[in-house]
């Protein structure tokens, strides 16, 4: 049985070949093996946004923030996902949180 990292690598290959649904499938397998696999949730957020599945994109972006609450980039990525999904107030809030994390203003 492949590991989460191996499934992630397969997902990257599929994404690079233009098979985003196939990549999503491999990433879903990866996070089912390890629900704390933040990089898998991050790529799922991006792919679901690309596939116009906003609710799933936001869910996975929020999971990254939950898993890595002190990482400014996690909030930046969440902001971008919110923006791409048309949720501007939430995007602005996540951007502000990223700034606070980056500047140590918690």
Please give the residue ranges for each predicted region.
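Alpha-helical segment of the N-proximal tetratricopeptide repeat
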Residues: 2-33
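Structural signature of tandem alpha-helical TPR/SEL1-like repeats
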Residues: 16-28, 51-63, 85-97
């Amino acid at each position: 049985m492949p590991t989460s990292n191996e499934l992630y690598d397969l997902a990257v290959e599929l994404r690079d070949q233009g098979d985003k649904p196939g990549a999503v499938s491999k990433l879903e397998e990866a996070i089912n093996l390890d629900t704390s696999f933040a990089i898998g949730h991050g790529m799922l957020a991006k792919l679901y946004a690309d596939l116009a599945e906003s609710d799933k994109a936001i869910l996975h972006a929020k999971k990254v923030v939950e898993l890595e609450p002190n990482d400014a980039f996690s909030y930046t990525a969440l902001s971008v996902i919110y923006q791409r999904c048309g949720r501007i107030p939430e995007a602005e809030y996540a951007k502000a949180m990223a700034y606070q994390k980056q500047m140590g203003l918690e």
